[in-house]
Amino acid sequence: HQQCINNRICYNAQVDLAGNVSIKLVRGNFVSEENPLFFKQLLSGVDIGQSDSSAKQMANFIYIIGDKNTRECVIVDPAWDIDGILNVIETEEMKLKGSLVTHYHPDHVGGSIFGMNITGLAELMEKNSAPVYVNKHEAEGLKQVTGLSDSDLRLTDSEEVLSIGSIDITFLHTPGHTPGSQCFRVGDSLVAGDTLFLQGCGRVDLPGGDSEVMYDTLTRRLAKIQDEVVLYPGHNYGGKPSAPMGNVRETNSYLQIKSLEDWLGIMGG
């Protein structure tokens, strides 16, 4: 039967006729059976898109968040293998109600980048035309990259809340990597896209990036996130899939830069 430690590390334990105990970790589900939150982390090139070398190289995290009682869910940053993502949702017996966009870069939403044509929201909408939630400052960029129309989008603002069943998802506008980058607060989890990684932050030298705005996001906008909240990033750059914000603050050198002047000297601006 399945057991969970601290609602995060889940495992199946079995005892054979000789009394031997075997334990198998359950990867990706980080909540207990008592908690209605459904939260699953997928890694491109590993959990989905296994045959795509670019998916493995880019190491994007995709998230499925929902309510285990109503079986409703949303996808965060659907890309690389839409059929694979939908197969996971079907296997989990969930119903897709929408997609959440952290930012408009093609490795997160589909499109062309670095000579790669990545499947994403355009293909998903052909199979399931549920609303796409994107920050109001990111909508134009998203439409250009994916070909979606205004009618496909639901524009979000900071501190707005989307309820999926009994699960509340709070949108947090965290610009810097792009003008409309956003994070999602779900209980004691923060899904951060490319705003913040375990060992770094999103680039500010790409179109729409702003070094000074990123510094404000990291030092002010995310400062209120409690140490015990677990950071779930947009890429597997840190060697681990997640970490408490308190640990990230201790080990991420980008969060230890004390002044805007020092920041601009390192990051440019």
Model-derived segments and spans:
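Zn-dependent metallo-beta-lactamase
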Residues: 4-73, 80-92, 123, 128
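Active-site-proximal beta-strand elements of phosphoester/diester hydrolases
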Residues: 38-46, 74-77, 168-175, 190-193
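Short Gly/Pro-enriched turn/cap motifs at secondary-structure boundaries
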Residues: 53-55, 152-153, 173-175
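Active-site HxH/HxHxD metal-binding segment of metal-dependent hydrolases
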Residues: 58, 81-168, 250-254, 258
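Active-site beta-strand termini and strand-to-loop segments that position acidic
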Residues: 65-69, 164, 184-187
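Short, glycine/acidic-enriched loop or turn micro-motifs at the edges of active sites
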Residues: 70, 80, 106, 138, ...
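Active-site neighborhood of phospho(di)ester-bond hydrolases with catalytic His/Asp-centered motifs
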Residues: 76, 97-105, 133-135, 174-176, ...
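Metallo-beta-lactamase
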Residues: 145, 168-173, 178-267
